[in-house]
């Protein structure tokens, strides 16, 4: 109970940030990571700038991330005795971690940071310690209760010269009910456009009707997620189902998706969740 009060208290300054934004600050449509979600905001006649982000778009990013964290917290604090609610909590956590690391990859790619050593030099142990152009100072308070840690898997990156591997982990002091949950994403260098343009293929999806209903309910509750392919939804749901199973031994669970382009340099992204205590 003390932990819950601590989290709620930490979100008090965030509410001021949220209410400070007005409808006219929002641009028409902003897609951060199309592979994961598409957010539709209030209508405006002003188009988004082509080359650089506007002040409104930066504010929108802050709002979206803040809302996603808060909604994940609410989902996990209202689990009760219903196993389906626990899966919903797990799915919210999986989506949040996946969204954060994909957005980080896109920013790194846009800045031309592709070499493992450069990644290693830039990545800080705690997510909130990243440079301000990666984690805005205004929303650092949002991430403090999550106790997020970052890392670069140099061994994996070294074995596959055309790939980088980043790790995002929930620390032991996280407010979420998954301390030690880690996510590793390995991705083809220079292929972030593959992640943002629905060009990934070879992802299997096989949710039954009941599971599909639970997944749809969770995605509808999380405002950041407007659109996601059925196959991605299936994979993320199956990961959440696994990590919330009390018999899970912590071994890796995940999937690999390939770009649609043919040839030896075909891009791919591999996602795995595991327990790292």
Swiss-Prot record:
Record keywords, A-Z: Glycoprotein, Membrane, Transmembrane, Transmembrane helix
Domain of life: Eukaryota
Residues modified by glycosylation: 155, 265
Cellular component aspect of the GO annotation: endoplasmic reticulum; membrane
Compartments reported by the entry: Membrane
Record's bilayer topology term: Multi-pass membrane protein
Keyword Transmembrane in record: yes
Transmembrane segments annotated in the record for this chain: 1-21, 85-105
Positions in the Extracellular compartment: 106-277
Cytoplasmic topological segments: 22-84
Protein name: Uncharacterized membrane protein YPR027C
Source species taxonomy: Eukaryota, Fungi, Dikarya, Ascomycota, Saccharomycotina
């Amino acid at each position: 109970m003390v932990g819950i009060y601590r989290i709620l208290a930490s979100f008090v300054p965030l509410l001021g940030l949220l209410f400070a934004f007005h409808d006219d600050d929002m641009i028409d449509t902003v897609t951060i990571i199309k592979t994961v979600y598409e957010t539709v905001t209030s209508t405006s006649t002003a188009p988004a700038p082509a080359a650089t982000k506007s002040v409104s778009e930066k504010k929108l990013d802050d709002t979206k991330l803040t809302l996603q964290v808060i909604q994940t917290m609410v989902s996990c604090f209202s689990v009760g005795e219903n196993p389906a609610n626990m899966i919903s909590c797990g799915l919210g956590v999986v989506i949040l971690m996946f969204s954060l690391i994909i957005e980080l990859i896109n920013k790194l790619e846009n800045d031309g940071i592709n070499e493992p050593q450069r990644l290693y030099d830039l990545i800080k142990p705690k997510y909130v310690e990243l440079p301000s152009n990666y984690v805005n100072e205004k929303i650092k308070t949002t991430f403090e209760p999550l106790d997020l840690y970052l890392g670069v898997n140099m061994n994996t990156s070294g074995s596959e010269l055309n790939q980088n591997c980043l790790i995002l982990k929930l620390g032991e002091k996280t407010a979420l009910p998954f301390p030690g949950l880690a996510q590793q994403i390995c991705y083809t260098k220079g292929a972030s456009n593959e992640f943002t343009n629905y060009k990934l293929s070879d992802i299997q999806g096989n949710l039954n009707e009941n599971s599909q209903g639970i997944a749809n309910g969770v995605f509808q509750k999380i405002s950041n997620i407007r659109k996601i392919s059925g196959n991605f939804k299936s994979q993320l749901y199956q990961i959440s189902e696994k990590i919330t199973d009390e018999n899970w031994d912590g071994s890796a669970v995940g999937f690999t998706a390939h770009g649609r382009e043919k040839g030896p340099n075909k891009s791919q992204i591999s996602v795995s969740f595991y327990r790292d205590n």
